[in-house]
């Protein structure tokens, strides 16, 4: 059967002084804006490609004025481009034995997991950690990278975790980050 790597989380940027941005980045400078109109776009996650041997889709960018968080990278599909993961805010995991996950964007997210065995798919990267690598000869999908907790809204909420890796036969899929 066919499997895929997990999708990467969308880019995570934070200006709350006691917290960090994704990918190990420091807190960003707060934005001070004048009264006026601003373009705000909430980027969607990558759409499911459906049944069959179709490439997964990247997430869309989120935009606030001049600030852009990059959409998450798609997970690799074993029959397309040797299963490589795609770059994004956080990188997609991969499927197959090419050992090439997608990269995250600096100060937004981490890479997807790595795999040389050709077994289960690796997890997508998260804001707080890379997707989990796959051990040799494993047919189990690995976990997505952890997100980051933020208390900017009052209560602590974890955001931007990576998607778990899929499996190519009777193995078990990985958990989300």
Report each predicted region and the residues it spans.
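Low-complexity, glycine/proline-biased repetitive segments and flexible coils/loops
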Residues: 1-177
């Amino acid at each position: 059967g066919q499997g895929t790597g997990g999708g990467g989380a969308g880019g995570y940027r934070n200006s709350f002084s006691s917290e960090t941005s994704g990918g190990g980045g420091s807190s960003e400078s707060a934005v001070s804006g004048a009264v006026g109109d601003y373009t705000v776009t909430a980027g969607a996650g990558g759409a499911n490609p459906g049944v069959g041997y179709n490439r997964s889709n990247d997430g869309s960018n989120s935009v606030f004025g001049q600030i852009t968080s990059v959409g998450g990278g798609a997970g690799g599909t074993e029959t397309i481009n040797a299963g490589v993961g795609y770059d994004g805010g956080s990188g997609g995991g991969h499927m197959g034995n090419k050992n090439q996950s997608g990269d995250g964007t600096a100060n937004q997210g981490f890479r997807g997991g790595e795999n040389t065995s050709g077994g289960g798919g690796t997890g997508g990267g998260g804001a707080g950690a890379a997707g989990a690598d796959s051990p040799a000869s494993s047919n189990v999908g690995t976990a997505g990278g952890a997100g980051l907790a933020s208390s900017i809204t009052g209560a602590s909420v974890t955001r931007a975790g990576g998607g778990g890796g899929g499996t190519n036969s009777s193995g078990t899929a990985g958990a989300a980050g």
